UniProtKB/Swiss-Prot annotation:
InterPro entries: Asp/hSer_DH_NAD-bd, Asp_DH, Asp_DH_arc, Asp_DH_prok, L-Asp_DH, NAD(P)-bd_dom_sf. This is L-aspartate dehydrogenase. Specifically catalyzes the NAD or NADP-dependent dehydrogenation of L-aspartate to iminoaspartate. It holds the Pfam family NAD_binding_3. Keywords: NAD, NADP, Oxidoreductase, Pyridine nucleotide biosynthesis. The active site is at H218. Its EC number is 1.4.1.21. NAD(+) binds at A124, N190. Belongs to the L-aspartate dehydrogenase family. One of its GO terms (molecular function) is aspartate dehydrogenase activity. Gene3D superfamilies: Dihydrodipicolinate Reductase, domain 2, NAD(P)-binding Rossmann-like Domain.
Length: 267
């Protein structure tokens, strides 16, 4: 049995937990929750029968195998460091934090030193297995074009001074590097960092706000010595959190299942 603790108790954490609870094979179980908003953690703990923790330190000190970070980019560093130092492996959902090269290296070296693992799920995009394999050759270009409903980008756009009510047709709201993208859209474009890490090449990112869109669309183009990789995924937004795709949560569930099963498919 894989014993799991969860940091961050929003819609994604709830979806992951309930999916694992419904798994008939029962090879993984969420046993404890923590959130900076204690009411959220207590509510999810009561709904699932798991432990409610009042601090991150309390959570990572428990008898757990794996910590799943579902909180925010700002929570990643503290969560991962404390988890690793307490003998736990970690899944990072807010992978945008790893656009910070210094932080990535810091966490990488700590995990290596302690003999622990940091897992980064593929998230809401397809083709990461092929991109990882292709990165063993020479990559010459990586491009991500993401189209989302305006309401899914609303908070990030308004922070940049854009009136989302004035967007009446598809509008390019960002075009630049992965580092700029995750800085301006920290809750919307984690996939750009996953893609960049998998390819070992900084992705060029374009974000389109579409008032008529009902899905989150991610188009990937990777060119290199292995040839060309093109993928396009149209994801349904998470029902309770339209900033992200339901597939992002399912990628974590699949990863947890892979960790608890004897056969793993794919790179």
């Amino acid at each position: 049995m894989l014993k799991i603790g969860v940091v961050g108790c929003g819609a994604i954490a709830s979806l992951i937990t309930k999916a694992l609870m419904s798994d008939r094979l029962n090879k993984a179980e969420v046993l404890a929750f923590y959130d900076g908003n204690l009411e959220k953690a207590e509510k999810l703990a009561m709904e699932t029968g798991a432990d409610f923790c009042r601090s991150l330190d309390e959570l990572v000190s428990k008898d757990l195998d794996l910590i799943v970070e579902c909180a925010s980019v700002t929570a990643v560093e503290d969560t991962v460091i404390k988890s690793l130092n307490n003998g736990k492996d970690v899944i990072i959902m807010s992978v945008g934090a790893l656009a910070d090269k210094d932080l990535f290296l810091k966490l990488y070296k700590l995990a290596e030193k302690l003999g622990r693992k940091i897992y980064i799920p593929s998230g809401a995009i397809a083709g990461i297995d092929a991109v990882k394999s292709g990165s063993l050759g020479k990559i010459s270009d990586v491009t991500l074009t993401t189209t989302k409903p305006v309401h899914g980008l609303k908070s990030a756009l308004e922070e940049q001074g854009l009136n989302t009510d004035e967007i009446k047709e598809p509008k390019v709201v960002f075009e630049g590097t992965v580092f700029e993208a995750i800085s301006k859209f920290p809750q919307n474009i984690n996939v750009s960092v996953v893609l960049s890490l998998a390819s070992r090449y900084p992705a060029k990112v374009k974000i389109i706000a579409d008032p008529n869109a009902v899905v989150n669309r991610h188009e990937i183009l990777v060119k290199g010595s292995i040839g060309t990789i093109k993928t396009c995924v149209e994801n349904n937004p998470c029902r309770d959190n339209p900033k992200t795709s339901a597939l992002a949560a399912y990628s974590v569930i699949r990863l947890i299942k892979d960790l608890s099963e004897p056969v793993r498919i794919g790179t």
